[in-house]
Amino acid sequence: SSDLPRRFRELDEEFFNRLGYGAFLRDAFDEYPDIEAEIKEVHVRRATTRKNEGSNLVDEGTKVIVRLYPELFVEGSKEISRVIRHELMHVSDMINSAFEYNVHEEFATSPMEERIITDRYRLFWDISIDGRLANKGLETTASREERKKEFNSFFSKIPDETRELIFDKMWNAEEIITHNRMVELAKDTNKVLALAAGSRTA
């Protein structure tokens, strides 16, 4: 949309606009008409590390903050497009009422448990997003093999065959895996295991 650039605020022009990177965002937004309809402002900020890349909804869901790692822009246009597409899919889920996103979710009472559950939750969401994008024939930040490797490292105690079944269900899920469902799975490995049996009561 032609008015998209005026929505961008607080950008480091040297880092972003003068290098023509706004075009990548415009192209990516064209893939997500739902975001353009709902969101009033998009802020692009620098992520301090690759792990800190991500997106957040603020101001009651009217503003998006996308954090991108500066080195991404050295890697070239394809990688920029992949990362932005992946991040905007997170945003698209957040504004989709069927996803049941809760920005105030408290994952656990202790910091260590919070970190473990949050990391699992993020992995499930990344698998869900990259699976949907890959199944549409779109390039994204990680391949099936890469996400499977991450999944294996998180759930190494689950037997290989069972793990493959569970991962496949997440990657090829016909219906969106909701926020609440991912929180449940992140908190309880038995519920993750139950996915292999196809249990909907898990």
What role is predicted for each listed range?
Residues 2-64, 115, 136-137:
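Auxiliary, metal-adjacent structural segments of Zn-dependent hydrolase domains
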Residues 147-202:
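Pan-zinc metallopeptidase signature
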Residues 133-150:
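Short helix/loop segments within enzyme catalytic domains
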Residues 94-127:
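Post-HEXXH active-site segment of zinc metalloproteases
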